[in-house]
């Protein structure tokens, strides 16, 4: 199974469109709050699966707890991929996309980490964010952010959130 994680939208039309987009290539869109259940279910039944997480989004206010430099700006980054990978010791694979010609793209699977529990807390998130930045710099025209990626400043985080859990 191939799962794509998504945040359900309040607007039914927009939500349906997002689910349709995330359903391409036989993917199964899973609301973000259900992903752990899906992972446990698939592991228990011995099924192979791939779960797709989008790492270029900005965390919500309650999750401003890990910051690093991203595209030359102090940026809060999501840590969910690392938390889930470490909890279940799942390998993390990144996707690198390139345009072949109009409407045609190729995707390479890049092994980021096969044993996340062997890393220090926060290291996988740093590796993932650096790789994402490298991919963006290689082909910036393939990236479109329809949200405000840098809408938060570090002062937004409560007391800098335990002084940035996992920060060195």
What do these predicted ranges mean?
Residues 24, 33-168:
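Non-catalytic C-terminal accessory region of glycerolipid acyltransferases
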């Amino acid at each position: 199974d191939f799962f794509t994680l998504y945040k359900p939208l309040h607007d039914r039309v927009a939500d349906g469109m997002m689910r349709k987009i995330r359903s391409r290539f036989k993917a199964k869109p899973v609301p973000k709050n259900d992903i752990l259940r899906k992972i446990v279910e698939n592991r228990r039944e011995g099924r192979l699966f791939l779960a797709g997480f989008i790492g270029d989004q900005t965390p919500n206010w309650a999750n401003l707890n890990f910051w690093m430099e991203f595209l030359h700006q102090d940026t809060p980054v999501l840590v969910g991929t690392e938390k889930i990978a470490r909890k279940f010791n799942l390998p993390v694979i990144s996707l690198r996309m390139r345009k072949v010609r109009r409407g045609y793209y190729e995707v390479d699977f890049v092994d980021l980490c096969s044993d996340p529990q062997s890393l220090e807390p926060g290291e996988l998130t740093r590796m993932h964010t650096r790789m994402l930045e490298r991919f963006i710099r290689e082909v910036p025209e393939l990236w479109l952010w329809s949200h405000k990626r840098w809408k938060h400043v570090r002062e937004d985080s409560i007391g800098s959130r335990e002084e940035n859990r996992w920060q060195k």
